[in-house]
Amino acid sequence: MAAQGFLLIATFLLVLMVLARPLGSGLARLINDIPLPGTTGVERVLFSALGVSDREMNWKQYLSAILGLNMLGLAVLFFMLLGQHYLPLNPQQLPGLSWDLALNTAVSFVTNTNWQSYSGETTLSYFSQMAGLTVQNFLSAASGIAVIFAFIRAFTRQSMSTLGNAWVDLLRITLWVLVPVALLIALFFIQQGALQNFLPYQAVNTVEGAKQLLPMGPVASQEAIKMLGTNGGGFFNANSSHPFENPTTLTNFVQMLAIFLIPTALCFAFGEVAGDRRQGRMLLWAMSVIFVICVGVVMWAEVQGNPHLLALGADSSINMEGKESRFGVLVSSLFAVVTTAASCGAVIAMHDSFTALGGMVPMWLMQIGEVVFGGVGSGLYGMMLFVLLAVFIAGLMIGRTPEYLGKKIDVREMKLTALAILVTPTLVLMGAALAMMTDAGRSAMLNPGPHGFSEVLYAVSSAANNNGSAFAGLSANSPFWNCLLAFCMFVGRFGVIIPVMAIAGSLVSKKSQPASSGTLPTHGPLFVGLLIGTVLLVGALTFIPALALGPVAEYLS
């Protein structure tokens, strides 16, 4: 089984790199403000019709545009969910959501989290799914990519005050990247058997003679951008383990590729725009090393399973609880690491049913900020924050002013970097503490002891880091949990974007210094090791005490 696991990981990464390389070249053109071939005329007409000016923006203007678009989307989606019973395409006559669930859901999809305190097939109409959630899947993904575009430009421009035009970037990202690729993926899903219709739910007789109501809906179109944009919110409650969303092993493989496609392509694009492709490869090496180790640990833990099962008469100790038999242990383990390394959160297995160590790895991947490939845009700017921190630490060790890509990293940048890195750990630890201190928080726990605490810690980690997956043994649809998680999602998203944009505004105004004999090379294996060590050190120092009370205690008990 070890050979099968190695072959699965190697095949996945090989296909991923082959697909991401050409996409990275296209993204590099957009970062350099070069229209893609054949799009200039269309862009001119659209910009004119929409009244979009291509005048460049400073970091505050760029940030204001991103925040303004997202706040408008939040308000529209909130009221849409409240009043969905007045809107069309609701064949099941589903009522509007409560204010707290509508707020939680609106914040969730605007922040690219897609945490779901509801069951899609029994709560949301087709209109809410399409015009509400799917639209935000596109816009939240485009927002994250636009932020990393601006951040990359900060390193490649010199003595300037502008970072590009947010509206131009958002339109180009949506029209020329997200929509075409999502369309291709959706058509493939439909061909493989995913649903795409507007029919009422269908009553059928099962082979046992019982009656069953089968949910319908425009699934494939939402499923495609759900994976491509690292959104993760399922059309159905079972998410990607549902055969109507993920009908075959081939669609499952494509879903995993779609999750990592844009984050990987952005690393290639960064290397091209920086004029040194080794810089992009360095980031990919660091991400890939952590990723492969984490996949190996989860596969090992799930294959070892629970030895007590053998004593109880089971044929095998392999942990198949909560997993689709059509996917198996190895694929389920790979998917779990992919979806939590990125900020996706889609699942084909119930993470709550993983072994203690198997469930701890996905939780830890979220807690370190989802910088191992990560979300579209957010993963790369999160990892680049750790790059700045690693450069700063190296500068302290050799007694030189830290610099990266020729830009000196001063006190202002390091303060903002520290702020951005500490936002999500603060939310996670304080949120989990608040939940455990209050009756409203503890009453949602369905399991006692360390596993119950793990469910709470996982939920807050998922929300604060904009992942959206869950240990399902937590009854989170209550005013307390909906409001707590909405706050964590909102601050976890925009509380990081704001200092990232401020860092970009500071760096873009600096001159690029030529490399000297004392310059730390940031493209070799030594720096890859330093970067991995920085990520692991921050994660260990921050979360080991909390993890010791949850999954570690469960493993040892």
Swiss-Prot record:
It comes from the Bacteria. Belongs to the KdpA family. InterPro entries: KdpA (IPR004623). Signal peptide: none annotated. PANTHER family: POTASSIUM-TRANSPORTING ATPASE A CHAIN (PTHR30607), POTASSIUM-TRANSPORTING ATPASE POTASSIUM-BINDING SUBUNIT (PTHR30607:SF2). Part of the high-affinity ATP-driven potassium transport (or Kdp) system, which catalyzes the hydrolysis of ATP coupled with the electrogenic transport of potassium into the cytoplasm. This subunit binds the periplasmic potassium ions and delivers the ions to the membrane domain of KdpB through an intramembrane tunnel. Keywords: Cell inner membrane, Cell membrane, Ion transport, Membrane, Potassium, Potassium transport, Transmembrane, Transmembrane helix, Transport. This is Potassium-transporting ATPase potassium-binding subunit. It is a multi-pass membrane protein. GO terms for molecular function: P-type potassium transmembrane transporter activity; potassium ion binding. The chain crosses the membrane at residues 5-25, 63-83, 132-152, 170-190, 253-273, 283-303, 329-349, 356-376, 379-399, 416-436, 484-504, 526-546. The keyword Protein biosynthesis does not apply. The keyword Ubl conjugation does not apply. GO terms for cellular component: plasma membrane. It comes from Escherichia coli (strain SMS-3-5 / SECEC).
